């Protein structure tokens, strides 16, 4: 009785909501089916990183969230506006969210993105030497 009434981790533990349990159960049942999607996502993420690096942008990410470091806030805003004009949903990430001088565009890829769309994004982005 003492532990049941005094042990904080036990006292403040509650059961998971049913929706969370159902979702987890669904994911576990279907996990193996998504291997092809995971491989596609890894491939397009790698292709985007490579394309950005070839244009002179530093991108150290190893995930499907690929940053394109623009430097100054004004550069990130201009780049985002240019991508938006070309039909891409791109928002600048600026201080205080990131340190000064590291403003960026953050691409969050999903398995629904096509290789052609990645190629179009890369083609739209100007090399570092021609930023203005």
Label the model's feature ranges:
Residues 17, 95-97:
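Short, ordered loop/turn segments at secondary-structure junctions
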Residues 1-62:
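Active-site C-terminal subdomain of aminotransferase-like
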Residues 34, 39-46, 53-87, 97-102, ...:
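Conserved PLP-binding catalytic core of the aspartate aminotransferase-like
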Residues 5, 88-91:
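Short gly/ser/thr-rich secondary-structure transition/capping motifs
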Residues 85-89, 97-132:
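PLP-dependent enzyme catalytic core of the Aspartate aminotransferase-like
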Residues 22, 39, 74, 116-119:
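A generic "alpha-helical surface" signal
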């Amino acid at each position: 009785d003492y532990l049941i009434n005094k042990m904080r981790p036990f006292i403040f533990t509650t059961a998971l909501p049913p929706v969370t349990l159902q979702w987890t159960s669904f994911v576990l049942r279907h996990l193996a089916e998504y291997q092809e999607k995971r491989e596609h996502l890894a491939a397009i993420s790698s292709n985007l990183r490579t394309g950005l690096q070839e244009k002179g942008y530093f991108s150290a990410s190893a995930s499907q969230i690929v940053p394109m470091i623009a430097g100054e806030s004004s550069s990130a805003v201009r780049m985002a506006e240019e991508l938006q004009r070309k039909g891409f949903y791109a928002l600048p990430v600026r201080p205080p969210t990131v340190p000064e001088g590291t403003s960026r565009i953050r691409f969050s890829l999903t398995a629904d993105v096509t290789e052609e769309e990645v190629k179009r994004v890369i083609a739209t982005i100007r090399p570092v030497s021609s930023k203005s």
